[in-house]
């Protein structure tokens, strides 16, 4: 595995690889890698001749009162996970390397961002789309891999790749969970011992809602109310949102039909956790 820290070198490598006909699987991350990231890397390894992993904590996608400075970082751990999962190139640029001067252009996302995390975090998805535009141009991937834990992000990325005719295949990958159902996340380290015991109830609330839908409930408000009440009963967390939308358009639905997403965000003392399920309802 080769570690690359400059845009120029990474671009030179990927241009040569693509010119020689090699397929490139790209996994963009902010580091502090866990089994969810490893799953993305293994899928990229299966489907491509070359695997590129980026580790970059992107300041553009953090708001003024968010956890940019304390976002967990451990490059030694990340290198080990990368090596264990078949990464060929680890792209690890500094902020100064990625943003050497003030940005004159950013990517503004105009759809699919006024709900869920986009509503709570204005500017977040503009930051995500801007850094991905840069990373796609640097790594020139054939395929790029994203976890469905950030399902809104996947919907936004699919839209922006289509809008700008970017020649990359977006590959969504199912959420990876702990044995008790908690979605794996770099931010889970912020949970207290008691909160960690409560956190699996987030996924249980979604499973309960899924059972109700499969049993015939089609009223979106009844389902989201059920989820909120369950989380408020079984955890000390504060429900930021529990919402149901058409997916991937993220349009409001009153009656549940077609492909939908049920998504939640819950604030604990030192961390905000998200989770979701997507399902197709006939």
Curated annotation (Swiss-Prot):
The active site is at 37 (proton donor). Catalyzes the condensation of pantoate with beta-alanine in an ATP-dependent reaction via a pantoyl-adenylate intermediate. GO terms for cellular component: cytosol. One of its GO terms (molecular function) is ATP binding. This is Pantothenate synthetase. The keyword Phosphoprotein does not apply. Belongs to the pantothenate synthetase family. It comes from Bacillus cereus (strain AH820). ATP binds at residues 30-37, 147-150, 176, 184-187. Pathway: Cofactor biosynthesis; (R)-pantothenate biosynthesis; (R)-pantothenate from (R)-pantoate and beta-alanine: step 1/1. It comes from the Bacteria. InterPro entries: Cyt_trans-like (IPR004821), Pantoate_ligase (IPR003721), Pantoate_ligase_C (IPR042176), Rossmann-like_a/b/a_fold (IPR014729).
